[in-house]
Amino acid sequence: MLDKQFKKETFKKSVKENVKFLYRKTLEEATQEQIFQAVSYTVKDVIIDHWLESQKAFNEQDPKIVYYMSMEFLMGRALGNNLLNLGAYDEVREALEELGLDINVIEDQEPDPALGNGGLGRLAACFLDSLSTLNYCAYGCGIRYHYGMFKQKIKDGYQIEVPDNWLKNGYPFEMKRPEYAKEVHFGGHVEVGWDPVKRENTFNHVGYQSVLAVPYDMPILGYDNKVVNTLRIWDAEPIVDFGLDSFDKGDYKKAVEQENLARNIVEVLYPNDNHYAGKELRLKQQYFFVSASLQEAVEKYKKNHDDIMKLSDKVVFQMNDTHPTVAVAELMRILMDQEGLGWDQAWAVTSKCVAYTNHTIMSEALEKWPVELFSRLLPRIYQIIEEINRRFIEQVQQKYPGNYEKIRKMAIIYDGQVKMAHLAIVAGFSVNGVARLHTEILKNQELKDFYEMFPEKFNNKTNGITQRRFLLHGNQLLANWITEHIGPDWITDLSQLNKLTVYADDEKALQEFMNIKFRNKQRLAKYILEHNGVEVDPHSIFDVQVKRLHEYKRQLLNILHVIYLYNDLKMHPEKDFYPRTFIFGAKASAGYHTAKKIIKLINSVADVVNNDPSIQGKIKVVFIENYRVSNAEMIFAAADVSEQICTASKEASGTGNMKFMLNGAPTIGTMDGANVEIVEEVGEENAFMFGMSSDQIINYERNGGYDPNFIYNIDTEIRQVLIQLINGTFSSDTELFRDLYDSLLTTKVSDRADRYFILGDFRSYADAQKRVEEAYKDQKRWAKMAFLNTAKSGKFSSDRTIEEYVKDIWHLDKVIVDKSKTRK
């Protein structure tokens, strides 16, 4: 329903006025990018009214607030999503058409805000969407990165990282809020004194460098309920203006020192930490946004509440992974050094306010900091962590007298390292995993000692995705079809999709469903032709793997299987082979050389396969450059097959698997993460599962016995595929892929051969791929499988996940902004 403020004539007039006001141009003279800005400011004007109404309701109703703290928020484009949530998309599209403008072209002008990279950031974005839609009060807390992680270019098959300058034209949906700026301190030292009245030590942090954290707010709209929450991202500015006096005297270095300190903190997401300076910068980033966010939260609480001891009644901090876990010590610092609480009081408050989400089973991803770095950069924070550690070790000794192995495994500070996950578990009142299997592995393997000591803290919250972004916005053809058949309630209650099952044997419905899939494939094929120069057949099977490039996600297994299929087709050209298009999209971290080499291999295989006339275009390989939310929406809608092939026990949950499922793509995957729960919902007959179980993998890792060389020696086809990596088939430089070849077969001091069991799962994967082909050839059977994946995806909404967080962890109250739009 069109918001009353979106009268078409008023809207058109406002767009023209904004073009004139912003650019001194008429609509006819303006560029498409300028028109995007003008349209966005028109929409923002309406959003701000709702934002103000929401703030008024929050102030009057005084609800408990969740501060969702995350290094990443991968929001995606805002214009179209905001229009859908306002209920004004169709009317605005018509208004723009009357001005001679195409809403799709205008939406394409918007840069993806470069505030995240992978699933961690996209989950945070989905959660904010659900919190607003479900009428809860929330703040997202993060960093306003000027250049994101990087913009990926592919040159000669290699990933090239260039700055993602998403702010170069200004971003219309953010608002600078300098009046809420906070000071953050680094370095210096702590002077310990004595308070004779309180008869206790005092701690005074002196000699520090300061940075000003300046907030920028982005509105997070609920769907059709007028609730607007806030994503608050912090930019860094120097405390003092540029030192012109120093500059005039020739001391340029001193003059720009403050400027550089601030700028470096917010320049990029995840600076390369292969070296000391990179590690220091990452720790600075984490403390910077955590300190600013906590200062703001405590200040906000104190405006309306007198008793700081009751902070947990109104505030909860959810730490998304280990990056924000320094929040534990920072909250203690604020409560003791600024609010005057004693240790026991501060601990009582902190341990009721902070909760931790674990996102990884892989121990190397659980952050640790060198004591030397941590204590130098954050001396007061380190002191507090030392004391938390001392008291915790006393607890462990009481529970397990004389068990020094327990202390070694559980200590927060040990062997010159500060272990952030341990800090979060010890201090937090809740520790959650993000899929049922993941949580069980945490409890029984990785965090077993902590689970035995604090079983009441551990719980599972299986991840989810927002259907409003990944179906309503990303696949409007399918969304409209679903609404025509079961009504619109699924938009805010995804379990309603189960009503579609009555159409699972309806030939007309299935044909319409597959026609929509084909139209989405045509749209993606057009994008691939425009961006890759590769012509792909929308009648072929679109087999898609899009996610961060990491060895455990096994893009290498996928491309080795493509080589295997290519060899088979070359050997048996007469074979009845159903055409396949293998689509990859992934960024590799700038310092992750193996991952970057896998990207090069994918592109080298594509060069050979796509240009071999003897296979008649039956296999195509495409690597989509600069994978991000805006092209992801198009990819999910077009996929036939969802590749979820990580090594079992390594993927905490995954959410791409849910997005593919929602859009009607059956999964080929291992029984890991949320794949397990997807198969439970849709049935094994509607998925293609393969590979070793997580128990088998964990057993091999603990006890040995896995030998990839044995597989290499007895399986001639696998051996041929690997030899082709080093015999010039895919590069005239026979050493180019030698390190990938060696990683699969050669055990080194630091790493065993084939760490992620690629050869061990290869045959099982190839067999599953054969089952995919056989199923797809039977189009009636495939249509039903694909359709049931959509119909059975109701569990995987982030709305369901958020309600579980609210019930079990956060204990929030719903806020009513528009009484006619209150959700139960």
Range-by-range predicted roles:
Residues 1-824:
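A conserved ligand/cofactor-binding region detector
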